[in-house]
């Protein structure tokens, strides 16, 4: 059981933690504005999720 916990933590460390953005919130919003995106909670079916805006729940939809 301990080996499963170890592999789960290792998997979390390798996949989830690097996916966090290192940009400050200001730069994340400016990046969305550069591509003429709109910050929304959820993107529609015909929109592309470009990344996160200032709040982590808001997505930049193009």
Curated annotation (Swiss-Prot):
Location in the cell: Secreted
Gene Ontology biological process terms in this record: cell chemotaxis; defense response to bacterium; innate immune response
GO terms for MF: CCR6 chemokine receptor binding; chemoattractant activity
Main location: secreted
Positions of disulphide bridges: 32-60, 39-53, 43-61
Pfam assignment, any one: Defensin_beta_2
Keyword terms: Antibiotic, Antimicrobial, Defensin, Disulfide bond, Secreted, Signal
Its biological purpose: Has antibacterial activity.
Protein family membership: Belongs to the beta-defensin family.
Protein name: Beta-defensin 110
Lineage: Eukaryota, Metazoa, Chordata, Craniata, Vertebrata
């Amino acid at each position: 059981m301990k080996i499963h916990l170890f592999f789960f933590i290792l998997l979390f460390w390798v996949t989830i933690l690097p996916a966090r953005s290192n940009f400050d919130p200001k730069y994340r919003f400016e990046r969305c504005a550069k591509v003429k995106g709109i910050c929304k909670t959820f993107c529609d079916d015909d929109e592309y999720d470009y990344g996160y805006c200032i709040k982590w729940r808001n997505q930049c939809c193009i």
